[in-house]
Every structure is written in structure tokens, then in C-alpha cells.
Amino acid sequence: MFPLVPLRSPPATEEQLLHQAQRVAGHTLGELAALAGLPIPQDLKRDKGWIGVLLELWLGASAGSKPEQDFAAMGVELKTIPVDSQGKPLETTFVCVAPLTGNTGVTWETSHVRHKLKRVLWIPIEGDRAIPLAERRVGAPLLWSPDEKEDRQLCQDWEELMDMIVLGHVERITARHGEVMQLRPKAANSKALTEAIGARGEPILTLPRGFYLKKNFTGALLARHFLLKT
């Protein structure tokens, strides 16, 4: 058996990616951080993306924060997902930043959301806050693409939310809009404003928004794959 080390370059195939993800499964974040030489924070309050960075390092991800998928050559996106002891998601999952202007002619088929969700490597992580960060274990990976029903659900929510953005109602969108996907402000501070369209078609400044998958959606896909009780 080869020693467990981070991939130094992006994997060439899905099989290689999945194999590395399966080798990482069962290890704690502390073990993986030590082997990779990555300092481990006390908690995630100021380092929200730390787990993602650690897994990207181990799996040889290439994109960083660029708009293409994490494994651009294969078109695969990496998503870590904190779960409870029953394997149920503890929080919503960020997909991408929502475009608030320049949306003429954009369709679901050509949208950034669909591009990002076309092929996803889900990696569940123990998320119980009672477990110290270094002791939380990495779960078994799942390589997923939306089936017809999931694609339809995502499409309906995307169209509803984009219609509201285009018609100048972005400020009226709440986290309750959407069955499986929601639109929420995404900004570290409330001073980071971006341009959008107002109710009368005028330019306005508002908080950047992001698309997030709701827990009912990610919970169902994990349950189906891992045969969990919902």
C-alpha cells in the first residue's frame, strides 16, 4: 500500500479522484492536517473555508476560487458537507455567487449553478460542535450528478429566483423562497455592496447574494446513497 500523501497534481480520472477520497475517509482532520503540514485552527469561526482547503490539498484540486469546477479537467466540483451522527446535513451548501445584473438570455442550461452542480464529489465531515475540530473524521465520498427529478427541482428554483432578480425584486427574496435551493446574502461585512436592478429598473446597491442548496435536498441525496433513515 502506498503511503497516504496529498496529491501533488490534479487527478487525471474520476477513478483516481475517488480512490484518493476513499483513502482519506476515516481519518481525522487533525491527522490529515499534520500529514499535509497545514496549521489547524482552534475552530472555524474565522476560518470557515479551512476544511475545504484541507480536502482540496489532499485531492489535488486545481480551481481555488476561480469560477470553474475544482477539478476543471474532469468537470467535477468538490463539496464538503458537515453532518450529524445520523449523517444528516447540519447546514446549507454554498453553490456559487448569483449574478445580479447582465442576465439577459441566461437559461438554466447555460447557468453557472448548473455548471457547478453537473458533477459533484460530496465528502461528509463530522460536524458535531462537541467534537474538537482536529478529532472530526472525514466520511466516505459520493460522486454525484443530479437525476432528472433533482435537475427539475433545481431548475424551477433557479428560474423563480432569477425572475425575481431580473424583475428588480432581489431585496424581497428571503431564505424561504425555493423548495431545494435558496438565495442568501453572501458577504463577510455589510459594507461590501454590489450593483443590482431595483423595482423600477434603476441600478441599486445591495449585498452580494449566493445560491445555497437547502438541507432537505442534500439530506435526501446523502440518505439515498448511504441508505440512511430519513
Swiss-Prot record:
- Source organism superkingdom: Bacteria
Q: Which UniProt keywords apply?
A: Cytoplasm, DNA damage, DNA repair, Endonuclease, Hydrolase, Nuclease
The answer, when asked if DNA damage is one of the entry's keywords, is yes
**KW Disulfide bond (keyword) present:** no
Q: Which GO terms describe its cellular component?
A: cytoplasm
What intrachain disulfides are recorded?
Answer: none
Q: State where it is primarily located.
A: cytoplasm
Q: Name one Pfam family in it.
A: MutH
**Gene Ontology MF terms in the entry:** DNA binding; endonuclease activity
Q: Where in the cell is it found?
A: Cytoplasm
What Gene Ontology terms for biological process does this UniProt record contain? DNA modification; mismatch repair
Which Gene3D superfamilies does the annotation name?
DNA mismatch repair MutH/Restriction endonuclease, type II
Q: What does the UniProt record say this protein does?
A: Sequence-specific endonuclease that cleaves unmethylated GATC sequences. It is involved in DNA mismatch repair.
**Similarity comment:** Belongs to the MutH family.
What is the protein name stated in its UniProt record?
DNA mismatch repair protein MutH
Organism, per UniProt? Enterobacter sp. (strain 638)
Task: Tell me the gene name.
Answer: mutH
